[in-house]
């Protein structure tokens, strides 16, 4: 639950709304609560309204968006462009990049605007769409990381060299999106775009969760706890178990020859890279999930003076996972590092930079050489990749 969503909760009394309002919307100067009605537009009190804090938030969100769009687009580009990169594991990594791109382009810009303005001014459609899209992308990322871990566990621990076919991998990706869409759907359905009158003559537009049920049965809390288990705790338990067994297997492995040593070393590096991806995902999302859970269980957390700032900082940390993955690919995986470099090189250097794609380029050079033997044939300059 976001800081402004709490004000729009259906089960809150006017007194509770006023109490929460005094935490978030009191004027910066000292004004008695009884006189708030005299000021038609009281200012936000929390630190997120300070200019210097807003500049930092703008820089943080824009940096995440820029790095995420560039990095994830590059991952998708090299997997599509180079045939040697079209492996099952890389298809799953590309799916991870697509999910992160969804967050970078559709969620973060609107979240930043919502945070800076202090109320939802983006209309009812985006009110339902943005939270749903973010939840969808996070679910897809978690499912994809789990599938990658299980696939590598199957191949390395049990020596099953018959890999998952590309057709099956696409089917798994489709199922991942379908299941994720179903799990995230309550955030689009049980949502309300409303105008809330906090005090007389002062209203704000709120995009808040609106769950059915009354009394002690809080469906919002039930959903939050369920998603924490399904989206975070259970996948991380499965992934940790899989990579622990993989690590143990590789550590105790004895290679009979130099060729197998090289193959074993490559597997180790790839596994290390994927473990780092999972660790970054787990660590970056842990503060946000924990804070969300505590907020849903204990409403007194909403009374914290800097609740909105804490929520925003944890959200920024969580969103860092959307650009961290491409950095890990480029840093820890030779294939990706080579492909990234190739994307910025000219074709005449392709064969020296990326041997896997050199055959087609060499064939083209031979054809151009034959043409250049005939008078009148002009030399064709190679184009950029």
UniProtKB/Swiss-Prot annotation:
SUPFAM superfamilies: Family A G protein-coupled receptor-like
Gene Ontology molecular function terms on file: peptide YY receptor activity
Topology relative to the membrane: Multi-pass membrane protein
Keyword Coiled coil: no
Pfam families assigned to the protein according to its UniProt record, in alphabetical order: 7tm_1
Disulfide bond annotation, renumbered to this chain: 127-207
Glycosylation sites noted in the Swiss-Prot or TrEMBL record: 11
S-palmitoyl cysteine: lipidated positions: 346
UniProt GO cellular component terms: non-motile cilium; plasma membrane
Transmembrane segments: 55-75, 91-111, 129-149, 170-190, 222-242, 274-294, 309-329
Keywords from the named record: Cell membrane, Disulfide bond, G-protein coupled receptor, Glycoprotein, Lipoprotein, Membrane, Palmitate, Phosphoprotein, Receptor, Transducer, Transmembrane, Transmembrane helix
Alphabetical GO biological process terms: adenylate cyclase-inhibiting G protein-coupled receptor signaling pathway; cardiac left ventricle morphogenesis; outflow tract morphogenesis
Location of this chain's protein in the cell: Cell membrane
Membrane topology, Extracellular segments: 1-54, 112-128, 191-221, 295-308
Cytoplasmic side: 76-90, 150-169, 243-273, 330-385
UniProt record similarity statement: Belongs to the G-protein coupled receptor 1 family.
Protein name in the entry: Neuropeptide Y receptor type 2
